[in-house]
Amino acid sequence: MIIHFTLNGAPQELTVNPGENVQKLLFNMGMHSVRNSDDGFGFAGSDAIIFNGNIVNASLLIAAQLEKADIRTAESLGKWNELSLVQQAMVDVGVVQSGYNDPAAALIITDLLDRIAAPTREEIDDALSGLFSRDAGWQQYYQVIELAVARKNNPQATIDIAPTFRDDLEVIGKHYPKTDAAKMVQAKPCYVEDRVTADACVIKMLRSPHAHALITHLDVSKAEALPGVVHVITHLNCPDIYYTPGGQSAPEPSPLDRRMFGKKMRHVGDRVAAVVAESEEIALEALKLIEVEYEVLKPVMSIDEAMAEDAPVVHDEPVVYVAGAPDTLEDDNSHAAQRGEHMIINFPIGSRPRKNIAASIHGHIGDMDKGFADADVIIERTYNSTQAQQCPTETHICFTRMDGDRLVIHASTQVPWHLRRQVARLVDMKQHKVHVIKERVGGGFGSKQDILLEEVCAWATCVTGRPVLFRYTREEEFIANTSRHVAKVTVKLGAKKDGRLTAVKMDFRANTGPYGNHSLTVPCNGPALSLPLYPCDNVDFQVTTYYSNICPNGAYQGYGAPKGNFAITMALAELAEQLQIDQLEIIERNRVHEGQELKILGAIGEGKAPTSVPSAASCALEEILRQGREMIQWSSPKPQNGDWHIGRGVAIIMQKSGIPDIDQANCMIKLESDGTFIVHSGGADIGTGLDTVVTKLAAEVLHCPPQDVHVISGDTDHALFDKGAYASSGTCFSGNAARLAAENLREKILFHGAQMLGEPVADVQLATPGVVRGKKGEVSFGDIAHKGETGTGFGSLVGTGSYITPDFAFPYGANFAEVAVNTRTGEIRLDKFYALLDCGTPVNPELALGQIYGATLRAIGHSMSEEIIYDAEGHPLTRDLRSYGAPKIGDIPRDFRAVLVPSDDKVGPFGAKSISEIGVNGAAPAIATAIHDACGIWLREWHFTPEKILTALEKI
């Protein structure tokens, strides 16, 4: 069929299949703003276009509908090198993070302002209601529109976007646009899907329909015979190598309990076979031709089921230890299943697979018996959290190709270096033969720390020699991604009558699902990032992680802290009620203070024993709680309106800024011939603005404009090793490596500048904009670089920095919530939510606020509406964004504020600490304690629903 239509003002004539999906059609025409985030359901809005004057989801159209249509995409906004009014406002406000659906947002807002000169909040919410944004938290979009409206009348107009910090510094703590924001909002090619070549093969995966089963028969011959099928991968022809999907530093503190394909299916969605074909359509047709028979086994779906004496064993294969094998290993293995499979454990992590225990650890300080004996009151409560999904706007995706004898991996990953190490081992290549290019990442939130499809894609390319694309559908994100661990946490508190704690005991039990990636470290962070908030002389913790047959779990932003913090905060609040003490008052009496030693962290490691006992070197909780109390009007009356009851709640929170003594970051900076700089950073910017942090740190040290610094990051050929984007490590680790590299280069520039000026080094200094200034005059960086590159020069000037540390940098914060609960219907309305955070010196204030809003809204979603639900046989019923319940713009609190409260930390660069992860840690307990304040009930399992409210009120 030949169709005629207008695309961004240009007439088009195309021969198409009448039923061809318009999103795919436009994307293949180069309209990269029209993306697919939700399997064509039109829920996410990443595919928004203007169709005959109306915003429409392109995925919901077929090609035949384009006949005589007028189509506009985000490519019509601005010019190739000039942002439109709305795009510029988005960049200036700092709303662009992962950027994946920001072109769609720009198009929708532009259309709104073309129709309504000054839209109300309700009109804004309505216009953006069809857009899904997992990272930005929505609040800053109101600022975008405010700024765009102001600039319509006055192009030079500004609004108050974010405060500034550190008057003694030039660029740190000041507004500066995110370095990659412009190309993202303009939809310039920067994601994996934008790099895929036309000749690429496609992978489609046949997945298990059973939660627990053995493959008894597998025949792929008919699929292999289908024209266009290039290869089929199964357990019969994949590498016989065991690994963990978790992208962590080696040796990994997780069981190596996965083979690329196995005989045993351990969850609905587990891998059966991968078809590599010349088109998606052929691959899908080939999947139907694969013959599989299963022996269906009883699934294990919960912690309690996993603990049962007669529980089915999820991992019944033999175990091999690299070091530290237990005395019982030979006897345990004598009862193991002999299928030719095994698992490997690098070092003791308390694993007992025959008991469904993936990992466990125990520790304590002080004398627990004495602590509880000294208590005037003792309480013990159990709290539960359910499974939640990261929902990155861009699903998992990988594109692999050969470059001569080298494997090139274009990946949407948080850990390019760990990815290279893992894949090189699996495909039997040396690391220098594997080139990982981390493209822009359309959202990660921990899920892209795990290696979930890259190894299959790489193996397919190595076997066939063909370029290969493997992209998860949204359904695969729910059944084959790694989600948040289910947890059951019991807290026992002993206290004096005045509320001061004498003993704290936490029993943290986690459900890791079918594989043990992060099974030690995520649950360990439950106590590690909650117990130190309330220092006590007598503390005991037990962590036990169980295998089951729910869909996989792994790294999710917060990394165990939200579950531990929910339990300790709720238990303390219940203690306060029993003692008739105000919740905020009991927090004040027990909370951590600046300079205080955090003794319990001397007993909790993350893959290895701690080398020292850290302290809270910087902590702004005193000021945070003062401001929060005033903002929420903590002690003011709470009016009642019929069935609606008002309540207020609070939670204090903490996080780490990297993993001392385990992780490392490196950086190299080159002085270019004209005096500008190129930074080769190993860090992985996944939308957090890390490249901008590195830019500003280099500019601050080198006294040059940030515009003179360009960052190349996350490319294993063109940067030095970095652990990757996890554990809130970017600013402290990658940032400090950049600072050290800049300082190293600064000394070289000063030395050669002094020589050129004929002065002692002690008499010269760097000065903005990019000169060495002495008593006799000054010389520019460009002149120094040129001198070095001459035939009699000293060579190119390069600075390097390597950062490791034994020290912790802890960001702190508090969340304050005000809710209204309808005691007749159970409805919960979150009216106010204030997130106040101490991230040290905010390097990028407007980006920091965006990180807080995004993380906080994800936490609100986890608390109010999000959960993966299963039937009795282990089939996940939640498989798309429409049914999952992640919040959109209409779900945010009416009064939603993020506040930066600075401190000065000795570990981070220029006093900075992490910001992106801590924001998810406090919403659940803040909301739950507010619900109790409103109607007197304790909800000990989150998320919170009207049914749970009414059940607790004994109305159903």
UniProtKB/Swiss-Prot annotation:
Pfam families: Ald_Xan_dh_C, Fer2_2, MoCoBD_1, MoCoBD_2. The keyword Metal-binding applies. Its EC number is 1.-.-.-. It is an enzyme of class 1 (oxidoreductase). Mo-molybdopterin binds at residues 414, 445, 727. InterPro entries: 2Fe-2S-bd, 2Fe-2S-bd_dom_sf, Ald_Oxase/Xan_DH_a/b, Ald_Oxase/Xan_DH_a/b_sf, Ald_Oxase/xanthine_DH-like, AldOxase/xan_DH_MoCoBD1, AldOxase/xan_DH_MoCoBD2, AldOxase/xan_DH_Mopterin-bd_sf. Its cofactor is [2Fe-2S] cluster; Mo-molybdopterin. GO terms for biological process: purine nucleobase metabolic process; purine ribonucleoside salvage. Keywords: 2Fe-2S, Iron, Iron-sulfur, Metal-binding, Molybdenum, Oxidoreductase, Purine metabolism, Purine salvage. GO terms for molecular function: 2 iron, 2 sulfur cluster binding; iron ion binding; oxidoreductase activity. Binds 2 [2Fe-2S] centers. It comes from the Bacteria. PANTHER family: ALDEHYDE OXIDASE 1-RELATED (PTHR11908:SF132), XANTHINE DEHYDROGENASE (PTHR11908). Belongs to the xanthine dehydrogenase family. This is Probable hypoxanthine oxidase XdhD. It comes from Escherichia coli O157:H7. The lineage of its organism: Bacteria, Pseudomonadati, Pseudomonadota, Gammaproteobacteria, Enterobacterales.
